[in-house]
Amino acid sequence: DPSCHSSQNEQDNRHYARAAKIAMVEPSDAQECKDFVALACEVSELFDTPVLYRTTTRVCHSKGLVEFGQRTEHTHAPYARNVRKFVCTPAHAYANHPLVEERLEKLREYGCTRALENGLNKLEMGDGRVGIITASIAYEYAKEVFPEGTSFLKLGLTFPLPMDLIRDFASKVEKLYVIEELEPFMEDQIKAAGIPCVGKELTGLLYELCLLYTSDAA
């Protein structure tokens, strides 16, 4: 809840995904709110992981025309007893920890490949002078404010970050910016990977972004 419109704080709940080492999906508009639920379920089934489906106040208060695709029927999978997986004793947790780390690596690879094909992540190359990595409602603001020719890497799968994709994108632009609300969640990880970028120096740590704040950064 950036700017505390209906809560006592504006804590950045993206950190929960990182702490729990699970996938996180963030839509930026009404169409994606519908589409990304199906993609989040796909991610969950493919990688046997919980998915944190994160929406912010501004995304939840948005509205727009939404196209529906063909309805897909799914059969319920039968219950299979799996004590090692579902009973988290110390011995089971010890054995399962490597599986969690392997899952994160597979999710990173998915973010660089399949997620680009199904629209979960989106790459929009411009003239190469300015590149912006962004997600959620910040993408909508940046698209409206920054001039034509700006390159965008718009992430719907925001944890784990597809670092190889980000590194490749960074190599194709002269100046790289990270635009996100609240904490420098993506920015810190990108800098930790040795990729120079500019972020909170321009947009700040407080409150939700808007066209005015984003235009100041531009």
For the regions a language model picked out, list residue spans one by one.
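Conserved PLP-anchoring active-site segment centered on the Schiff-base-forming lysine
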Residues: 218
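Thiamine diphosphate
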Residues: 1-46
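Flexible, low-complexity linker and terminal segments
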Residues: 27-215
